[in-house]
Amino acid sequence: MIRKAEFKDVSGIMQVAKDAHQKSLSRSVPLDAKTLRNNLQVCVLSAEHFVLVVELDGNIEGAFIGVTHQLWYSRKKQATDLFFYVTDKGTGWGAKMMRRFISWAKENRGVGEIMLGIGSGIGDPGRTRKLYERMGAIKIGDNFILPEE
Protein backbone atom coordinates (compact mmCIF):
# COMPACT_ATOMS: atom_id res chain seq x y z
CA MET A 1 0.00 0.00 0.00
CA ILE A 2 1.07 3.59 -0.60
CA ARG A 3 0.87 6.00 2.29
CA LYS A 4 2.29 9.28 3.47
CA ALA A 5 5.61 8.73 5.22
CA GLU A 6 5.88 9.12 8.96
CA PHE A 7 8.92 9.83 11.12
CA LYS A 8 9.10 6.13 12.03
CA ASP A 9 9.68 5.32 8.32
CA VAL A 10 13.02 7.13 8.05
CA SER A 11 15.11 3.97 8.59
CA GLY A 12 13.11 2.06 5.96
CA ILE A 13 13.42 4.93 3.48
CA MET A 14 17.16 4.97 4.17
CA GLN A 15 17.41 1.30 3.14
CA VAL A 16 15.51 2.02 -0.09
CA ALA A 17 17.76 5.03 -0.77
CA LYS A 18 20.90 2.96 -0.13
CA ASP A 19 19.65 0.29 -2.56
CA ALA A 20 18.97 2.95 -5.19
CA HIS A 21 22.34 4.61 -4.61
CA GLN A 22 24.20 1.34 -5.23
CA LYS A 23 22.44 0.99 -8.59
CA SER A 24 22.84 4.63 -9.64
CA LEU A 25 25.51 6.31 -11.73
CA SER A 26 26.40 8.30 -8.59
CA ARG A 27 27.44 5.21 -6.61
CA SER A 28 31.08 6.42 -6.59
CA VAL A 29 29.97 9.40 -4.47
CA PRO A 30 30.07 8.19 -0.86
CA LEU A 31 26.68 7.98 0.80
CA ASP A 32 26.84 9.46 4.30
CA ALA A 33 24.25 7.76 6.52
CA LYS A 34 24.07 10.63 9.03
CA THR A 35 23.49 13.21 6.31
CA LEU A 36 20.91 10.99 4.63
CA ARG A 37 19.05 10.41 7.92
CA ASN A 38 19.04 14.13 8.79
CA ASN A 39 17.79 15.14 5.35
CA LEU A 40 15.08 12.46 5.34
CA GLN A 41 13.89 13.63 8.75
CA VAL A 42 13.60 17.18 7.41
CA CYS A 43 11.70 15.98 4.34
CA VAL A 44 9.22 13.91 6.36
CA LEU A 45 8.50 16.79 8.77
CA SER A 46 8.47 19.69 6.28
CA ALA A 47 5.27 21.08 4.74
CA GLU A 48 7.27 21.93 1.59
CA HIS A 49 8.08 18.25 1.05
CA PHE A 50 5.84 15.38 0.02
CA VAL A 51 7.07 11.94 1.06
CA LEU A 52 5.32 8.69 0.20
CA VAL A 53 6.30 5.12 0.92
CA VAL A 54 5.27 1.78 -0.53
CA GLU A 55 4.76 -0.57 2.40
CA LEU A 56 4.38 -4.28 1.65
CA ASP A 57 4.25 -6.91 4.38
CA GLY A 58 5.52 -4.38 6.93
CA ASN A 59 8.58 -3.38 4.87
CA ILE A 60 9.28 -0.16 2.97
CA GLU A 61 9.73 -1.21 -0.68
CA GLY A 62 9.63 2.19 -2.34
CA ALA A 63 9.74 5.89 -1.67
CA PHE A 64 8.95 9.16 -3.37
CA ILE A 65 10.19 12.54 -2.20
CA GLY A 66 8.90 15.71 -3.81
CA VAL A 67 9.50 19.32 -2.85
CA THR A 68 8.31 22.79 -3.73
CA HIS A 69 10.61 25.77 -4.05
CA GLN A 70 10.27 29.25 -5.44
CA LEU A 71 11.29 29.62 -9.05
CA TRP A 72 14.29 31.90 -9.39
CA TYR A 73 12.46 34.10 -11.93
CA SER A 74 8.94 34.18 -10.47
CA ARG A 75 6.85 34.43 -7.33
CA LYS A 76 5.40 31.05 -8.29
CA LYS A 77 6.84 27.79 -7.02
CA GLN A 78 7.96 24.66 -8.80
CA ALA A 79 7.16 21.18 -7.51
CA THR A 80 9.82 18.64 -8.39
CA ASP A 81 10.85 15.11 -7.53
CA LEU A 82 13.97 14.62 -5.43
CA PHE A 83 13.84 10.85 -5.14
CA PHE A 84 11.64 8.21 -6.76
CA TYR A 85 12.52 4.53 -6.45
CA VAL A 86 10.85 1.19 -5.83
CA THR A 87 12.62 -2.07 -5.04
CA ASP A 88 11.99 -5.18 -7.11
CA LYS A 89 9.27 -6.13 -4.61
CA GLY A 90 7.69 -2.68 -5.03
CA THR A 91 7.49 -2.86 -8.82
CA GLY A 92 4.13 -1.68 -10.12
CA TRP A 93 3.54 0.98 -7.45
CA GLY A 94 5.50 3.79 -9.11
CA ALA A 95 2.69 5.16 -11.28
CA LYS A 96 0.36 5.43 -8.28
CA MET A 97 3.00 7.32 -6.30
CA MET A 98 3.59 9.66 -9.23
CA ARG A 99 -0.15 10.37 -9.58
CA ARG A 100 -0.34 11.19 -5.86
CA PHE A 101 2.58 13.61 -6.20
CA ILE A 102 1.03 15.34 -9.21
CA SER A 103 -2.26 15.74 -7.33
CA TRP A 104 -0.44 17.15 -4.30
CA ALA A 105 1.51 19.59 -6.48
CA LYS A 106 -1.63 20.79 -8.28
CA GLU A 107 -3.39 21.36 -4.96
CA ASN A 108 -0.36 23.12 -3.46
CA ARG A 109 -0.99 26.85 -3.43
CA GLY A 110 1.46 28.86 -5.49
CA VAL A 111 2.83 26.01 -7.62
CA GLY A 112 3.18 27.24 -11.20
CA GLU A 113 4.85 24.20 -12.71
CA ILE A 114 5.67 20.58 -12.01
CA MET A 115 9.11 19.33 -13.05
CA LEU A 116 9.83 15.60 -13.30
CA GLY A 117 13.30 14.21 -13.85
CA ILE A 118 14.99 10.99 -14.87
CA GLY A 119 18.53 11.36 -13.65
CA SER A 120 19.77 8.38 -11.66
CA GLY A 121 20.71 5.98 -14.41
CA ILE A 122 18.69 3.24 -12.70
CA GLY A 123 16.43 0.98 -14.70
CA ASP A 124 14.92 1.78 -18.07
CA PRO A 125 14.68 5.56 -18.58
CA GLY A 126 12.48 4.98 -21.64
CA ARG A 127 9.89 3.23 -19.49
CA THR A 128 9.91 6.09 -16.98
CA ARG A 129 9.67 8.65 -19.81
CA LYS A 130 6.59 6.87 -21.16
CA LEU A 131 5.03 6.92 -17.69
CA TYR A 132 5.59 10.67 -17.41
CA GLU A 133 4.22 11.27 -20.91
CA ARG A 134 1.08 9.24 -20.11
CA MET A 135 0.58 11.61 -17.19
CA GLY A 136 0.76 14.63 -19.49
CA ALA A 137 4.41 15.61 -19.12
CA ILE A 138 6.37 16.99 -22.07
CA LYS A 139 10.06 16.15 -22.54
CA ILE A 140 12.10 19.37 -22.46
CA GLY A 141 15.72 18.28 -22.32
CA ASP A 142 18.26 15.78 -21.07
CA ASN A 143 20.45 15.35 -18.00
CA PHE A 144 24.16 14.59 -18.15
CA ILE A 145 26.66 13.47 -15.52
CA LEU A 146 30.44 13.46 -15.66
CA PRO A 147 31.31 10.25 -13.83
CA GLU A 148 34.33 10.13 -11.59
CA GLU A 149 37.32 8.78 -13.48
Residue ranges and their predicted role:
Residues M1-Q15:
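A short beta-loop-alpha structural element at the N-terminal edge
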Residues Q15-V29:
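Helix-loop element at the rim of GNAT/NAT acetyltransferase active sites that forms part
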Residues S28-F50, L56, F64-S74:
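A conserved beta-strand-loop-helix scaffold within acyl/acetyltransferase catalytic domains
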Residues K96-E113:
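Conserved acyl-CoA
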